[in-house]
Amino acid sequence: MAKIMVAMSGGVDSSLAAALLHEAGHDVTGVTLHLWEGDDDRLAESLCCSQEMTESARRVCAQLGIPYYVFNYQREFRRYVIEYFLREYASGFTPNPCLECNREIKFRALLARARTLGFDYVATGHYARIRADETRHNGEDAGLPPAERAQRTTYRLLRAVDREKDQSYMLYMLGQDDLARLIFPIGEYTKAEVRAMAAARGLASANRPESQDICFVPGGDYRNLLREERPDALRPGPILDLEGREVGRHQGLPLYTIGQRRGLGIATGQPMYVTALDVARNAVIVGPESALRRESLRAEWVTFVSGMWPEAPFDCLAQIRAHADAVPARVIPGEAGTVDVHFSRPQRAVTPGQAIVFYDGDVVLGGGRIARD
């Protein structure tokens, strides 16, 4: 029997994760991370930090008869996620704050706290799988001491069985020490199976709808947050075509992203898309749809799940956004955490600031941030 901390959002996925581990005989404790204090009705009730979701997690733990606690990580969330989010936008990148939340809060900080409190493992409701050597690890072998597991096992991170819900792209930053202490109990199930299993157990969260929003930007409209927190970053400037001709004016680089067509306020006689954000000139660059396609990119801050930097170029599948298809690519390792990636076919709207993740079939090799040219 292992002592397992389950990170619970109040949704059905983490609720079932807790239930499955409890049923398997483990000593399970549920925890919710309080990350963001919404004011002026910014925080919707369906979002992970809302009072309603916290109460949902509490009710599930009461049903299961397991302890439940709320950890306050607002200060860390502000520092590592919100400030990053604002800084990246102000610098002409399009960030993915959920990646930083996973990296700094949900895994780095929570794993450290779990270790301090004497827990063997942390479990979450993520749709992904961990394989120890050739043996799938989803909680069945959680009785092994973590130190022993880590010493004798190589861990691989895999896509979930449910490809529509797969979250492995968001977990590429996990390393061997992380995977040795993590459990993803629902990675082998489809979402429909998860809901059915939760309903069969009478879990209060069985039919709770999912939220697709960034937790501190309900509705996906980050512009108001930028206006409140970084008004200096919203400097008007020119919209330039590919020949450098001014075809309009923009209201601030952070309000635009690669591939955007709507809301440009320009009339050029043909559809025009944002192809680049030129920070040096404070200019939005636009061009035809064909100009969005890229055959290669450079990635920075690259890490590999194995913990080992590749010594030679390698072929893999590369995915440039959370819900994009992974396509064949060749990765050429560089220096200081950078790689060059050459695609087998041009990719549309490659966006600096987003993540690129490398796969070998279902296995996550690693990933990094797409750099600016």
Swiss-Prot record:
Transmembrane segments: none annotated. It catalyses: S-sulfanyl-L-cysteinyl-[protein] + uridine(34) in tRNA + AH2 + ATP = 2-thiouridine(34) in tRNA + L-cysteinyl-[protein] + A + AMP + diphosphate + H(+). It comes from the Bacteria. The active site is at C101 (nucleophile), C215 (cysteine persulfide intermediate). Signal peptide: none annotated. GO terms for molecular function: ATP binding; tRNA binding; tRNA-uridine 2-sulfurtransferase activity. One of its GO terms (cellular component) is cytoplasm. Gene3D superfamilies: Adenine nucleotide alpha hydrolases-like domains (2.30.30.280), HUPs (3.40.50.620), Translation factors (2.40.30.10). Coiled coil: none annotated. The keyword RNA-binding applies. ATP binds at A7, M8, S9, G10, G11, V12, D13, S14, L33, G125. Keywords: ATP-binding, Cytoplasm, Disulfide bond, Nucleotide-binding, RNA-binding, Transferase, tRNA processing, tRNA-binding. Disulfide bonds join C101-C215. GO terms for biological process: tRNA wobble position uridine thiolation. Catalyzes the 2-thiolation of uridine at the wobble position (U34) of tRNA, leading to the formation of s(2)U34. This is tRNA-specific 2-thiouridylase MnmA. It comes from Roseiflexus sp. (strain RS-1). The gene is mnmA.
